[in-house]
A protein has these predicted regions:
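Catalytic cores of Mg2+-dependent Asp-rich isoprenoid enzymes
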Residues: 1-147, 152, 156-228
Length: 228
């Protein structure tokens, strides 16, 4: 399966924005995206998700892996000097999804969004070869914003997987999976919580877009498209 497939199929906005990037940069972004997507899919699509992701992480830690995507990712990690911290934080976030998820607060959902998406933004910034110290922070915020958007969009789908990302303190009661899936549940309460997530995301989108000026000029327009 071609690496470009992962962005074309799963990240449509970035795929089309990527057409404005240099081919080598877009190819490296595709490797990063494929690496992250495969790890995430191990959690979403398998009953033995914990053992699957642990095996993937072990493969990554090996000097040479049998997994082509892992080997290609490790090459770009060296090429762009991507810190291990972001990979380790990504793995930590993905492993959180191997068990039922119930987020308690706004602070907790932001932290979770950093682990699973802010880290990806930071790694993308390294591929874009930005040397400005503020660029990474803004890239992390853009990743968080995109994850919050995904959470707002996929509330019911996530609930069916046993995951409630809407913070419990957004409600006046203990929200359970059956409440979200049940059509008889007060949808106004649910929509109000989703609206809060969307409002939260806007602050992070603003920060992410403010960071575009720190990127090389050739990168700015594609990233603006991807974040729009």
């Amino acid at each position: 399966m071609k690496l470009e497939f992962y962005i074309k199929h799963y990240g449509k906005s970035f795929y089309w924005a990527g057409k404005f990037l240099k081919k080598d940069i877009f190819a490296d972004c595709s490797i990063l995206y494929a690496f992250c997507r495969i790890a995430d899919d191990l959690v979403d699509n398998n009953k033995n998700s914990k053992s699957k992701i642990n095996k993937f992480i072990k493969e990554y830690s090996n000097v040479k892996s049998k997994n082509i995507i892992i080997n290609q990712f490790k090459k770009i990690q060296i090429k762009y000097n991507i810190p291990n911290k972001f990979i380790n934080d990504l793995f930590y976030g993905i492993k959180l999804d191997t068990k039922p998820v119930k987020i308690k607060s706004k602070e907790e959902i932001i932290k979770y969004s950093y682990y699973v998406a802010g880290t990806v933004g930071a790694m993308m910034a390294h591929i874009f070869s930005t040397n400005h110290p503020k660029a990474i922070k803004h890239a992390i915020d853009l990743g968080i914003a995109m994850q919050l958007t995904n959470i707002a969009r996929d509330v019911v789908t996530d609930a069916k997987l046993g995951r409630i990302y809407l913070p419990q303190n957004f409600f006046r009661q203990n929200i359970k999976v059956k409440d979200i899936v049940n059509e008889n549940f007060d949808r106004n309460k649910l929509f109000a919580a989703i609206t809060k997530i969307i409002i939260m995301s806007e602050k992070f989108y603003k920060s992410g877009n403010n960071g575009i000026k720190y990127l090389p000029r050739a990168i700015r327009f594609p990233i603006f498209l991807a974040s729009s």
